[in-house]
């Protein structure tokens, strides 16, 4: 068990407008590598925000300030034992080639509501994009700038130089 320190925002890296199911996420992450998966023991995210703004729980968790072993997800190497991970469906252009902020208005509203509610419940959280911890464009938007725009306190914004953006 470790202290919960971070909320890391991800995208599914799927083409703009293409919906994704939780079963697809589970397959992508937990199927063996020879069957097209990553071979992980568990999924990489706690929740997923669908195109219509619906937030679907993928891994249950409690609301305390700790990550129990059963709550760990595989969202960012080296950070999983102290982070919660949320993903929005999308993140690349319609051709599936370039990183793009494809969040629908409903997804933006849902993510904003989620972040604000959870920083109230977890005031110690620092919120980051996956790109802060891996050489990826994920979640395909500037998390720090967006957090400032929606009025998140500076103490809750992870500000270390990103790996990629």
Which residues make up each language-model segment?
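Basic/polar, cationic surfaces and motifs that engage anionic cell-wall
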Residues: 1-12, 16, 39, 52-55, ...
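Active-site-adjacent loop/helix micro-motif of nuclease/hydrolase catalytic cores
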Residues: 17-21
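Short Gly/aromatic-enriched secondary-structure transition segments
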Residues: 22-31
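Short coil-to-helix leader/linker segments, especially the first N-terminal amphipathic alpha-helix
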Residues: 24, 55-56, 66
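Extracellular protease catalytic domains of secreted zymogens
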Residues: 36
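Alpha-helical scaffolding within the catalytic cores
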Residues: 62-74
């Amino acid at each position: 068990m470790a202290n919960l320190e971070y909320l890391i925002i991800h995208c599914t890296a799927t083409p703009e407008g293409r919906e994704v199911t939780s079963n697809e996420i589970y397959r992508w992450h937990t199927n063996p590598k020879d069957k097209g998966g990553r071979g992980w023991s568990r999924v990489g995210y706690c929740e997923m925000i669908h195109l219509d703004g619906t937030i679907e729980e993928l891994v249950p968790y409690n609301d305390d300030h700790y990550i129990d072993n059963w709550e760990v997800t595989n969202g960012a190497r080296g950070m999983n034992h102290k982070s919660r991970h949320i993903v929005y469906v999308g993140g690349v252009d319609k051709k599936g080639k370039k990183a793009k902020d494809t969040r629908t208005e409903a997804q933006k509203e849902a993510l904003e509501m989620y972040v604000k509610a959870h920083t109230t419940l977890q005031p110690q959280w620092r919120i980051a994009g996956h790109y802060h911890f891996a050489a990826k464009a994920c979640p395909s938007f500037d998390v720090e700038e967006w957090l400032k725009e929606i009025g998140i306190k500076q103490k809750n914004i992870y500000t270390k130089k990103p790996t990629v953006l």
